[in-house]
A protein has these predicted regions:
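Solvent-exposed, acidic/flexible segments
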Residues: 33, 50-53, 57, 70-74, ...
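The canonical Cys-X-X-Cys-His
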Residues: 43-51, 112
Length: 119
């Protein structure tokens, strides 16, 4: 009887692990890449940022690398693109960063930031 109980527990544990992995993977797959790129185009983000190539601003892959593993990464990037704070350019001058607050919903902004961080 004890052997059947142990086998059942192992099988149940395996199913729970598979379910947990499946649901956690789905949360990472929630980024709508097309919507993120569309929002970036609509707000002229690609004028200064390339996906993987520097322009006047850093490439999004570099932004992702800079913030990778940091707990406050999403909040910092959302603040940066919604506050109009200063952006530093390669030649040393500073300008107000384009502010997309009011031009997109909070969910669209979060999706854009999540896409950038996924690169």
């Amino acid at each position: 009887m004890k052997m059947k109980y142990q086998a059942f527990n192992k099988e149940l544990l395996s199913m729970v692990c598979v379910a947990a992995f499946t649901f956690s993977a789905n949360s990472f797959a929630a980024v709508d890449v097309d919507a993120a790129k569309s929002l970036a185009r609509e707000n002229s983000c690609f004028k200064c940022h390339g996906t993987d190539k520097d322009k006047d601003g850093p490439a999004y892959t570099k932004v992702a690398a800079k913030y990778r593993g940091k707990a406050d990464a999403e909040a910092k990037l959302i603040h940066h693109i919604t506050s109009g704070e200063k952006a530093k350019f390669p030649d040393g001058h500073e300008e107000d960063h384009k502010n997309i607050q009011g031009k997109a919903s909070p969910e669209e902004i979060k999706n854009l930031v999540d896409w950038i961080l996924s690169l």
